[in-house]
């Protein structure tokens, strides 16, 4: 489901899985990985657990008129926008820090746990959230509740919690 979803998403915006810059790895869902190995299928970028996030980065680049190549670079307009949203949401300044690169090749910003909690609370409740982010928060929250299997995958803790609480709790 994850792989087909990413492929279809990219096709809808006029891109291909070769545009993903997340790298590839075997699915964390062991049954899927074993099936691929048994079938002689080697993992591609669309099998990366973060390929959906990367499809989102690519879509954002296209919607805002930015080039979609090199979207994972810290100085790319997409990543600068991500940094800006984090700063506003988490009430933290990140420009003095150098980002680390996470397991799927995107800049990852260190910040105090308190600021992460502030950001999560703001996005979860929309209280004290920058007004320009409120609609996005509502859309994301509804999507997570309606499609918990797309948040983390089959059998994952996040998926089970979202499915069980049906909108009363948001986790990722």
Where are these regions (language model features)?
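Solvent-exposed, flexible loop/coil residues
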Residues: 24, 41, 62, 103-105, ...
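Conserved SxxK-family serine transpeptidase/carboxypeptidase catalytic domain
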Residues: 131-172
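Short helix-capping and hinge/turn segments at secondary-structure transitions, especially at repeat
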Residues: 91-92, 118-129, 145-153
